């Protein structure tokens, strides 16, 4: 399925301003001001300056929390977003109960204890983000994430992503669930992308972000096979 | 959600010809001719006369199999449909490899051996059919059944039905619930889950008596929308998310 740009010229605008470039800008800006995030049980609140808030929006990290403060903006980040900025881009600091978490292991353990499948979801999130996909919550489509080729103001999301892991996967076990997901994603013009995160059982590293290195991600798209569109003479290529 | 009739006058037609009446007619007609269905590994083929084929279609049992025969019509029934006609309506016989299965327990055991979840599905199917809902496969909506108030030519289906038991694989995580609710909503149906309570694993499953002991719990799941649930509009403001309520209309 080709990307569906939202307006004429959106594709040219996207090509002129690649997401990777905006992310680099954001990174240097956040590092400079030593932006600080506050960890709660389900998200991270990040306090930034207004130009940084604009940059975060352009890269699609978090959501702006409406506040009356003029010089400071509050951004609500999901665990995956916050850990990506903290661990991968190394451009924000995070504190819990007023104490800054210097060590990434502490943060990893806190987030894992708040959210059981955090390790798997984070691996999938960073896998896609590293390829410069923009990743948003897939709540309204009954999936884990939706991914965009560029900023959501320019293009519709192309993939609805389900994250699966060995032993922990509660989705797509029965046909009715597969039919349901494929029909729903098809009806909103997305492809269903299933990311299988394989983890090696290694008890030593299990509690450390280092275990991410051992995880592998397998990508699969699932769609309906339509006999009319799959005639032999048309699919020779 | 109110029933969506397909054309003006469809509701009047439905009221004039209740499904229960057509089913009684069908029951009489099939019993008279002693119709017999042939069991295969996934369905039952029933040979009937043209008038009976028409009656089966009016009651929405099975699908017509195209053939060149003029006097006989072949109808393909699902296990649930065939067993309902055989056991509840007692109007067809079932045969396997040319041998008539006199005992309904034999048929039950055969169907159960081919499809382990047959007892649960049959309980759900007969539960809704007994209330004169017309049931069809929910394959295209990722559910087990869709339920119609009357014949599908008159009305759109109102409920998409998921059949659940204690160890079912659906609706265990939020993303699945969101998916099923959104899909059902987008095709103007309400998601209905039928929880069949009973022991499916024990020896009892071999006995038809267990059908009597199974109970069915009905729940509809719909999205809770704050705008549509303002206090002045609905006095029961203490609804859960998603809105789960007992289904009184069934």
UniProtKB/Swiss-Prot annotation, chain A:
Keyword Lyase (UniProt): yes
Q: Which GO terms describe its molecular function?
A: lyase activity; nucleic acid binding; tRNA-intron endonuclease activity
Primary localization class, coarse: nucleus
Output the GO biological process annotations, alphabetical, semicolon-separated. Answer: mRNA processing; tRNA splicing, via endonucleolytic cleavage and ligation
Query: Where does the record place it?
Result: Nucleus
InterPro entries of this UniProt entry? tRNA_endonuc-like_dom_sf, tRNA_intron_Endo_cat-like_sf, tRNA_intron_Endonuc_cat-like, tRNA_intron_Endonuc_N, tRNA_splic
**GO CC annotation:** nucleus
Task: Name the catalysed reactions.
Answer: pretRNA = a 3'-half-tRNA molecule with a 5'-OH end + a 5'-half-tRNA molecule with a 2',3'-cyclic phosphate end + an intron with a 2',3'-cyclic phosphate and a 5'-hydroxyl terminus
Q: Which domain of life is it from?
A: Eukaryota
Active site residues of this protein: 148, 156, 190
Task: Give EC number(s), comma-separated.
Answer: 4.6.1.16
Keyword list, A-Z: Lyase, mRNA processing, Nucleus, tRNA processing
Changing residue 191 to T has the effect of:
In strain: cv. Landsberg erecta
Q: What happens upon changing residue 27 to Q?
A: In strain: cv. Landsberg erecta
Could you tell me what this protein does?
Constitutes one of the two catalytic subunit of the tRNA-splicing endonuclease complex, a complex responsible for identification and cleavage of the splice sites in pre-tRNA. It cleaves pre-tRNA at the 5'- and 3'-splice sites to release the intron. The products are an intron and two tRNA half-molecules bearing 2',3'-cyclic phosphate and 5'-OH termini. There are no conserved sequences at the splice sites, but the intron is invariably located at the same site in the gene, placing the splice sites an invariant distance from the constant structural features of the tRNA body.
- Kindly state the subunit structure of this protein: tRNA splicing endonuclease is a heterotetramer composed of SEN2, SEN15, SEN34/LENG5 and SEN54.
Q: Which PANTHER family match?
A: TRNA-SPLICING ENDONUCLEASE SUBUNIT SEN2
For this chain, the family text in UniProt reads: Belongs to the tRNA-intron endonuclease family.
Q: What is this protein called?
A: tRNA-splicing endonuclease subunit Sen2-1
Organism placement in taxonomy: Eukaryota, Viridiplantae, Streptophyta, Embryophyta, Tracheophyta
Q: Which gene encodes it?
A: SEN1
UniProtKB/Swiss-Prot annotation, chain B:
Active site at 148, 156, 189
What is any one of the record's Gene Ontology cellular component terms? Answer: nucleus
Q: Origin, by domain of life?
A: Eukaryota
The protein's matches in CDD domains, at most eight in alphabetical order, are given as: tRNA-intron_lyase_C (cd22363)
- Annotated GO MF terms: lyase activity; nucleic acid binding; tRNA-intron endonuclease activity
Predominant location of this chain? Answer: nucleus
Task: Give the span(s) annotated as Disordered.
Answer: 225-250
Q: Which Pfam families match?
A: tRNA_int_endo, tRNA_int_endo_N
Broadest EC class? lyase
Catalytic activity, reaction form: pretRNA = a 3'-half-tRNA molecule with a 5'-OH end + a 5'-half-tRNA molecule with a 2',3'-cyclic phosphate end + an intron with a 2',3'-cyclic phosphate and a 5'-hydroxyl terminus
Q: Where in the cell is it found?
A: Nucleus
- Biased composition of type Polar residues is found at 234-250
**Entry annotated with the keyword Phosphoprotein:** no
Which UniProt keywords are present, listed alphabetically? Lyase, mRNA processing, Nucleus, tRNA processing
Tell me, how does this one assemble? tRNA splicing endonuclease is a heterotetramer composed of SEN2, SEN15, SEN34/LENG5 and SEN54.
Q: What is the protein's known function?
A: Constitutes one of the two catalytic subunit of the tRNA-splicing endonuclease complex, a complex responsible for identification and cleavage of the splice sites in pre-tRNA. It cleaves pre-tRNA at the 5'- and 3'-splice sites to release the intron. The products are an intron and two tRNA half-molecules bearing 2',3'-cyclic phosphate and 5'-OH termini. There are no conserved sequences at the splice sites, but the intron is invariably located at the same site in the gene, placing the splice sites an invariant distance from the constant structural features of the tRNA body.
The UniProt similarity line reads: Belongs to the tRNA-intron endonuclease family.
This chain belongs to which protein, by name? tRNA-splicing endonuclease subunit Sen2-2
């Amino acid at each position: 399925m080709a990307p569906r740009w939202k307006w004429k010229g959106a594709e040219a605008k996207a090509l002129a301003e690649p997401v990777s470039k905006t992310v680099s800008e954001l990174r240097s800006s956040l590092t400079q001001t030593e932006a600080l995030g506050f960890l709660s049980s389900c998200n991270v609140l990040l306090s930034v300056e207004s130009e940084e808030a604009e940059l975060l929006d352009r890269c699609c990290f978090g959501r702006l929390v409406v506040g009356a403060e003029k010089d400071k903006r509050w951004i609500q980040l999901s665990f995956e977003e916050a850990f990506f900025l903290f661990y991968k881009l190394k451009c924000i600091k995070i504190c819990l109960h007023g104490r800054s978490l210097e060590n990434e292991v502490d943060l990893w353990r806190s987030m894992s204890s708040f959210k059981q499948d955090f390790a798997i979801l984070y691996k999938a999130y960073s896998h896609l983000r590293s390829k410069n996909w923009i990743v948003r919550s897939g709540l309204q489509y009954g999936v884990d994430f939706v991914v965009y080729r560029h900023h959501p103001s320019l293009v519709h999301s192309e993939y609805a992503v389900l994250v699966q892991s060995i032993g922990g996967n509660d989705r797509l076990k029965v046909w009715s669930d597969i039919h349901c997901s494929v029909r729903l994603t098809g009806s909103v013009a997305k492809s269903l992308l299933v990311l299988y995160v394989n983890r090696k059982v290694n008890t030593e590293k299990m509690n450390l972000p280092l275990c991410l290195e051992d995880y592998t991600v397998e990508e699969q798209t699932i769609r309906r096979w339509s006999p009319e569109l799959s005639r032999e003479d048309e699919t020779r290529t | 959600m109110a029933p969506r009739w397909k054309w003006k006058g469809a509701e009047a037609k439905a009221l004039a010809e209740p499904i229960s009446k057509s089913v009684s007619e069908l029951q009489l007609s099939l019993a008279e001719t002693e119709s017999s269905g042939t069991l295969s590994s996934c369905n039952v083929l029933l040979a009937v006369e043209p008038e009976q084929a028409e009656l089966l279609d009016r009651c929405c049992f099975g699908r017509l199999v195209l053939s060149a025969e003029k006097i006989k019509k072949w109808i393909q029934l699902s296990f649930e449909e065939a067993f309902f006609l055989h056991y509840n309506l007692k109007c067809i016989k079932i045969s396997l490899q040319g041998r008539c299965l006199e005992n309904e327990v034999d048929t039950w055991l055969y169907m159960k051996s081919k499809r382990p979840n047959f007892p649960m599905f049959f309980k759900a199917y007969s539960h809704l059919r007994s209330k004169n809902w017309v049931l069809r496969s929910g394959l295209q909506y990722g559910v087990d059944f869709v339920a119609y108030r009357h014949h599908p030519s008159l009305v759109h289906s109102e409920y998409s039905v998921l059949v659940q038991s204690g160890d079912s694989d659906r609706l265990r995580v939020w993303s699945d619930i969101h998916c099923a609710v959104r899909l059902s909503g987008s095709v103007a149906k309400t998601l209905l889950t039928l929880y069949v309570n009973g022991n499916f694993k024990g020896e009892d499953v071999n006995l038809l008596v267990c059908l009597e002991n199974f109970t069915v719990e009905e729940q509809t799941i719909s999205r809770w929308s704050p705008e549509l649930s303002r206090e002045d509009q609905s006095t029961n403001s203490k609804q859960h998310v998603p809105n789960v309520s007992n289904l009184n209309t069934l």
